[in-house]
Amino acid sequence: MILISVQELQKSFGVHEVLRSVTFSLQKGEKMGLVGVNGCGKTTLMRIIAGEMQPDGGTIHRNKDLRVGYLAQLDDIPLTDTVWGALLKVFEPIRVMERRMAEIEKLLESADPETALRLSSEYQRLTESYNAQQGYAYEGEILRVLNGLGLKPEMHQRQVSTLSGGERTRLSLAKLLLQKPDIILMDEPTNHLDLEAIEWLQDYLTDYKGSLLLISHDRYFLDHVCTTMGELLGGKMIKFTGNYTEYMKKRTADFETRMKAYELQQKEIQREQAIIERYRRFNREKSIKAAESREKRLAKVERLEKPVEEQHVRFSFDARRRSGEEALEVRELSKSFEGQPVFQNLSFKLRTGDRVALIGPNGVGKSTLFRILTHQINPDHGSVRFGTNIDIGYYDQHQQNLNPQNTILDEVWNAFPKLEQTRIRSAL
């Protein structure tokens, strides 16, 4: 059963055309990954489907009474709510039944026979509806989702206003999952999730009975969750059956097939044009008519678009000068915030050329360690020693070291004032 059908969708921002002719459908139970280069219109398409943005052209047909849930960057959860209270609101219809059932139980204690019969009948109807909606299980479901997303019991009574941006995003995700819409729209849901929470979410979405439209740069997440893939390329949608790995194999084969068809058509067009040109050079009535006939036939041929191959970014990190064999030594490093230890007695060494991934659940101190290594904060105890001729490059996930008032060119140029502008532009 088709839940959403998109036909010839178009969207531009000024003179920049983002979506040119997007056509696809989403079936019941289908879990579709949406991929494409940055700026190709993935989030724009998702916002249009969610009803947050209007297209310039085309149509979207949704099944009647279709419930669509959209995980955007921000949610409308009141800041004065507690974490637990915000999620209880998802089950407000069930809680209304609970309150009415409790009220009936009290009324039955002093009701006359006629009233008792009426109240008992209402109580039975409520009980049947309550059980059908698994009203007895909703608090356990809230706990399961909160714990799965890394929002531990000690956070459940905290006000939303005290949560970090990442914690609020996880709370919004928890609310969306508990609402159980027919279609879930997710834009980068693994942001702000640690590995354990990502694995939990993978399993949850794999077992989810509804449909899913997902934007993610995490190919392993896409592999685990998705049953189809949709690629936005040149303002259009190309859809593939299978997960991300299968999509990449089919995409390569599809690109080669389309390129071969395009090249064959171009070759045939050039051959026809050469014949037309030769006929015209004869400059005879018969040959001119033959040329005009071929021109008309050629004009009716539907031209194939040249397939566009996705450009890949390639980074090269070259040291500015030769360093010593030992790059970094950390000894007995400890750090606490407001009396709460983040890590204690941390020791390790890095040698020149080592490549180390720093992993762990949220809150264990990964970013804190980086801030100590880059001299943004001081440790409580321990020492950090860098080797000879070591320069540090630091990429902050929140880009707090960028000046929002600068242009992109000026921001880089201010950091490297001696570089030529052409070299900076080439890097950008």
Model-based region annotation:
Residues 101, 108, 123, 130, ...:
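Heptad-repeat amphipathic alpha-helical coiled-coil interaction surface used
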Residues 294-312, 355:
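ABC transporter TMD-NBD coupling linker
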